[in-house]
Amino acid sequence: MLILTRKVGESIVINDDIKVTILGVKGMQVRIGIDAPKDVQVHREEIFKRIQAGSPAPEKHEDTH
């Protein structure tokens, strides 16, 4: 696992087309923004595990774009 340190407003880039930006930190929560192509699925881990287990994905909301 690669471990990086970023400040609010800073980003990392993955594969030239995915950008992850730190939007804010409040206590133990970190808000991140993810810019990715439409064909790249982005899910929270607990949603991804549900999808893998065959459960239906929840309705479209903040997890998808």
From Swiss-Prot:
Disulfide links within the chain: none
One annotated Gene Ontology cellular component of this protein: cytosol
Source domain of life: Bacteria
Subcellular location: Cytoplasm
Record keywords, A-Z: Activator, Cytoplasm, Repressor, RNA-binding, Translation regulation
GO BP annotation list: mRNA catabolic process; negative regulation of translational initiation; positive regulation of translational initiation; regulation of carbohydrate metabolic process
Chain ranges passing through the membrane: none
GO MF term (any one): mRNA 5'-UTR binding
Family: Belongs to the CsrA/RsmA family.
Subunit structure: Homodimer; the beta-strands of each monomer intercalate to form a hydrophobic core, while the alpha-helices form wings that extend away from the core.
Functional summary from the UniProt entry: A key translational regulator that binds mRNA to regulate translation initiation and/or mRNA stability. Mediates global changes in gene expression, shifting from rapid growth to stress survival by linking envelope stress, the stringent response and the catabolite repression systems. Usually binds in the 5'-UTR; binding at or near the Shine-Dalgarno sequence prevents ribosome-binding, repressing translation, binding elsewhere in the 5'-UTR can activate translation and/or stabilize the mRNA. Its function is antagonized by small RNA(s).
NCBIfam families: csrA (TIGR00202), PRK01712.1 (NF002469)
The protein's name: Translational regulator CsrA
Gene transcribed to yield this protein: csrA
